[in-house]
């Protein structure tokens, strides 16, 4: 960004440099200029917001199917009867999980 040259007046007994009234005033930065000049800051801010969301998000309960030699346990599932009906349990071919 170019700045206008400043003019100083040196008249008077003390010869103090003071800006004259001929200086140009520039419009404030636009949002686009601000964001384009602060890309790293913007990226770090977004990363911080995503990190905070991941940390504070409530954990979602996962549907679990535990099959042991003794039993089949279905936990936290909305339709356990549908899952149990689709499991192909038989001693001669092992356990097969269908794609639901």
Curated annotation (Swiss-Prot):
Keywords: Host endoplasmic reticulum, Host membrane, Membrane, Transmembrane, Transmembrane helix, Transport, Viral movement protein. Residues 1-41 are lumenal. This is Movement protein TGBp3. The keyword NAD does not apply. Belongs to the Tymovirales TGBp3 protein family. Plays a role in viral cell-to-cell propagation, by facilitating genome transport to neighboring plant cells through plasmosdesmata. May induce the formation of granular vesicles derived from the Endoplasmic reticulum, which align on actin filaments. The chain crosses the membrane at residues 42-59. GO terms for cellular component: host cell endoplasmic reticulum membrane; membrane. The keyword Cell membrane does not apply. It comes from Narcissus mosaic virus. Signal peptide: none annotated. Disulfide bonds: none annotated.
């Amino acid at each position: 960004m170019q700045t206008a040259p400043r003019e100083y007046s040196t008249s008077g007994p003390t010869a103090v440099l003071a800006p004259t009234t001929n200086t140009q005033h520039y419009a404030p930065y636009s949002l686009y200029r601000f964001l384009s000049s602060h890309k790293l800051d913007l990226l770090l801010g977004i990363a911080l917001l995503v990190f905070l969301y991941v940390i504070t998000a409530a954990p979602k309960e996962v549907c679990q199917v535990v099959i042991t030699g003794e039993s089949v346990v279905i936990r936290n599932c909305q339709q356990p009867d549908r899952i149990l009906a689709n499991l192909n349990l038989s001693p001669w071919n092992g356990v097969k999980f269908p794609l639901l």
